[in-house]
C-alpha cells in the first residue's frame, strides 16, 4: 500500500501522465518538467497560506532572561523543511496556563517596552528577524526574576521549502499527494494556454479547489455539524 504523500518526481510524473507527456527519470529532463517545479513552488505557497495544516506544525522553545524583552526563535537546528516559519500560532510560557495575547500594533509594543515593566509575560509580538533570518518575538512585561530560566514555547506553521528541479526529486512534499497533483495539473493547463482560463482549466481548477478545501476541512476534526467560513472557502467541518 503506497503512501498518500508523494515525492516531487512522483507528482511531476503523475501530471505528465494526465497531460499525455512521457514520464521522466529526473525533473530536469525537459522544459515541461523544469517549469512544473516552478509551478509546484507556487502551489506550495498557496496551500500554506490557505490555513493551518497538521503536516506543517512545529514548535520551538527559548529560555527567558530576566529583564530581556526580545528573543530569537532558533529554527536552524531543525530539519531542512522546517527552517523557515510561515506563521506563529501561539506563544506560551512555563508557569502560566493561558497563552500570551498577541500585540498587532508595533507602535503599541514600542510604547509598552519603554515602560520597562517587569513581571509575568502576558503579551507578545513578532518583531522582525535577527541577523541570520530567525524570527524574533518580543514579550511584555519583561520576565521577572522568578521567570528567569523558564521556557517560552512557540507553536508555528513552517514554510515549505523551495524545490529545485533535479536536486529535490526524492523529497516528499508535505501536503496530501492528490491535492498537489490536481493543483499542478490545473496550473500546467493554465500555463500551457498562456493564462487563458479555458474550459479545460476551469474544470481542472474546480477539482483542485474541491480537493483542497475538503482536505483542509479534515484538519480540524471534521464532523459535519459546523460550517467553517474563510475567504475563498465555505466548507462544513
Located regions from the model:
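Glycine-enriched, solvent-exposed interface loops adjoining structured elements
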Residues: 1-237
Amino acid at each position: 500500500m503506497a503512501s498518500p504523500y508523494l515525492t516531487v518526481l512522483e507528482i511531476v510524473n503523475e501530471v505528465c501522465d494526465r497531460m499525455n507527456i512521457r514520464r521522466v527519470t529526473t525533473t530536469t529532463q525537459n522544459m515541461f518538467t523544469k517549469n512544473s517545479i516552478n509551478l509546484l513552488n507556487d502551489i506550495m505557497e498557496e496551500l500554506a497560506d490557505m490555513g493551518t495544516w497538521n503536516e506543517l506544525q512545529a514548535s520551538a522553545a527559548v529560555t527567558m532572561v530576566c529583564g530581556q524583552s526580545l528573543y530569537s526563535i532558533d529554527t536552524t537546528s531543525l530539519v531542512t523543511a522546517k527552517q523557515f516559519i510561515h506563521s506563529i500560532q501561539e506563544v506560551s510560557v512555563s508557569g502560566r496556563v493561558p497563552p500570551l495575547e498577541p500585540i498587532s500594533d508595533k507602535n503599541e509594543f514600542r510604547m509598552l517596552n519603554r515602560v520597562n515593566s517587569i513581571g509575568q509575560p502576558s503579551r507578545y509580538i513578532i518583531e522582525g528577524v535577527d541577523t541570520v533570518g530567525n524570527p524574533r518575538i518580543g514579550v511584555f512585561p519583561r520576565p521577572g526574576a522568578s521567570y528567569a530560566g523558564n521556557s517560552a514555547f512557540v507553536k508555528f506553521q513552517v514554510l515549505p521549502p523551495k524545490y529545485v528541479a533535479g536536486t529535490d526529486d526524492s523529497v516528499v512534499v508535505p501536503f496530501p499527494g492528490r491535492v498537489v497533483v490536481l493543483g499542478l495539473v490545473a496550473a500546467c493547463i493554465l500555463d500551457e494556454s498562456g493564462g487563458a482560463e479555458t474550459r479545460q482549466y476551469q474544470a481542472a481548477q474546480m477539482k483542485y479547489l474541491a480537493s483542497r478545501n475538503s482536505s483542509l476541512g479534515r484538519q480540524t476534526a471534521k464532523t459535519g455539524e459546523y460550517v467553517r467560513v474563510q475567504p475563498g472557502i465555505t466548507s462544513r467541518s
